[in-house]
Amino acid sequence: MISFNNVSKVYETGGQSVHAVEDVTLSVEKGEIFGIIGFSGAGKSTLLRLVNMLERPTAGTISIDDKEITSLSTKELRKLRQRIGMIFQSFNLFNSRTVFGNIAYPLKLAKVPKNEIKERVNELLKFVGLEDKANNYPEQLSGGQKQRVGIARALATSPDILICDEATSALDPETTTEILNLLKKVNREYNLTILLITHEMHVVKEICHRVAVMEKGKVIEEGKLFDVFTQPKTKTTQNFVRSVINDHLPESVLAKIQNGGQIYRLTFTGEETGQPVLSYIAKNYNVDVNVLYGNIIELQNVLFGNLLVELQGEQREIQKALQHLRLQVQLKEVEAHAS
């Protein structure tokens, strides 16, 4: 659907070259929700602006449906942009227009007949749950309602691609969940390809099928959501994952661990998360088990469990217990931690 091939964007500032995007190669499949995460200045927003040619790449090519877009004429570019909807962190609504007027705006630009505009806007108002707000103005709406208007407006021209630029960053947690559920509904019912950028890993966890991590203009890690979450390779990705799975033990906890105790990280996937493995080894081996941290999250309908445990006992018994864990519980990873 969307392909970036060795794409770079360089700005000349004060006689210096700034690489906002550097040699990025990515593919976004049709109908998926693809997340791009990174800290401020990572190059996320610049990469998005390249998709609809608000910025042109300094090097490399960008293709949509196998058609290279960097050389499109003005007329062709106008048609392309009608296929791409966009929602923003700051909503970008017209304060002087009603909710109906904001949603209708791109249809008027496309010279859609008035009766079709009315039908389409009413359809979208129902879809985003704002049927009773058609005649309200943006100042009369909550942040979540404003973003719903933004989503409806982005869908007005029946695009193939929806770009989300930090779409939930200005919202409270409850409203964020509501908007993410709406975006999942958009993806499911319209089979829309969604390209989303954020600096919040919990947003990626809730909605994305695949994710790329950007740092200093480069993609440093990319893959399926489950793989990136459960096996983060880079330090930056590990830090993002810890914002959702904060398994860092406080010094006060480490200080209480008895001499001779050993800490292990256990990770479980799927049905493994429901197995009583710790009670089994406590009963069948001469080992004391102290759970220091544990959680279970769901990633694309697959459970992922994460435990940090302290094992106390003779080294021989601990090794027997670990061997059982590895063989019987399909232990994904056991990692010793220094206390």
UniProtKB/Swiss-Prot annotation:
Name the CDD domains on file.
ABC_MetN_methionine_transporter (cd03258)
Q: Which GO terms describe its cellular component?
A: plasma membrane
What's the source species for this entry? Bacillus cereus (strain ATCC 10987 / NRS 248)
PROSITE patterns associated with the record? ABC_TRANSPORTER_1 (PS00211), ABC_TRANSPORTER_2 (PS50893), METN (PS51264)
Where is the ABC transporter domain positioned along the sequence? 2-241
**What Enzyme Commission number does this protein have?**
7.4.2.11
Protein name, UniProt field:
Methionine import ATP-binding protein MetN 2
Q: How does it assemble?
A: The complex is composed of two ATP-binding proteins (MetN), two transmembrane proteins (MetI) and a solute-binding protein (MetQ).
